[in-house]
Design a protein with these regions (language model features):
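Residues forming the Rossmann-fold NAD(P)(H) cofactor-binding site
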Residues: 55
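NAD(P)H dinucleotide-binding glycine-rich loop of Rossmann-like/cofactor-binding domains
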Residues: 1-43
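Residue-level preference for short coil/turn positions at secondary-structure junctions
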Residues: 4, 40-41, 67, 123, ...
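Short regulatory "switch" loops immediately downstream of catalytic or recognition motifs
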Residues: 21-31, 84-90, 154
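Adenosine-nucleotide cofactor-binding segment
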Residues: 41-42, 47-50, 58, 62-137
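Glycine- and charged-residue-rich phosphate/anionic-cofactor binding loop of Rossmann-like
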Residues: 6, 125, 175-179
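Structural motif
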Residues: 36, 63, 118-119, 142, ...
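Glycine-rich phosphate-binding loop and adjacent beta-alpha segment
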Residues: 85-96, 131-179
Length: 179
């Protein structure tokens, strides 16, 4: 009851988003030290990222002190993508040093190829998945770059949900997962 309840209801989801950004980690070649957080000035993708939590992640990615230089946000709903682009414009992101793109992956013959093209084929440093959909998680795995960190943010309700990942890349490309 009252303002405190309302403010608390807004703070909890954002604290989850902030925690997610800080849970991401990266490693250095020949070192076992984990550098916590997203890659500053790196390449980030937010998949299925225009729902309420995804919008919070876009906001945080653009306005946080540690932000990517490239942010690609995907979804399969044009109306939601349009709304996200109105709330967080590429121009606003550019003022903060972030090149922002919104992409409808449903309209693409090969979403992985198209998304990796934003990185000149190198893949993304940080990828967040905001929907508990196995093919989406697998897509995220395929767009990771060297030392890429994949965060499965979406809490699945199905305890049997599983997806394939490239184990070779876990070992040789230093891919890692957090959730």
């Amino acid at each position: 009851e009252g303002d405190a309840f309302y403010m608390g209801s807004l703070a909890e989801p954002m604290s989850c988003i902030v925690g997610t950004f800080h849970a991401m980690y990266h490693t250095r070649k020949d070192s076992y030290v984990h550098d916590m957080g997203i890659v500053e000035g790196g390449k980030m993708a937010i998949l299925a990222g225009v729902g309420p939590m995804g919008l919070g992640a876009i906001d945080y990615a653009i306005h946080n002190e540690r932000r990517p230089s490239l942010l690609v946000v995907t979804d399969i709903d044009n109306a939601r993508l349009k709304r996200a682009a109105e709330l967080f414009t590429p121009e606003e992101a550019a003022r903060h040093g972030v090149e922002l793109h919104y992409v409808n992956t449903k309209e693409l013959a090969d979403p992985v190829e198209r998304l990796k093209a934003y990185t000149n084929g190198d893949g993304f440093d940080d990828v967040m998945v905001f929907a508990p959909v196995a093919p989406l998680f697998e897509q995220a795995d395929r767009i990771l770059g060297q030392d890429g960190c994949l965060n499965f943010f979406a809490g699945p309700t199905n305890p049997e949900l599983s997806a394939n990942i490239n184990i070779y890349d876990v070992h040789y490309a230093s891919h890692h997962l957090v959730g």
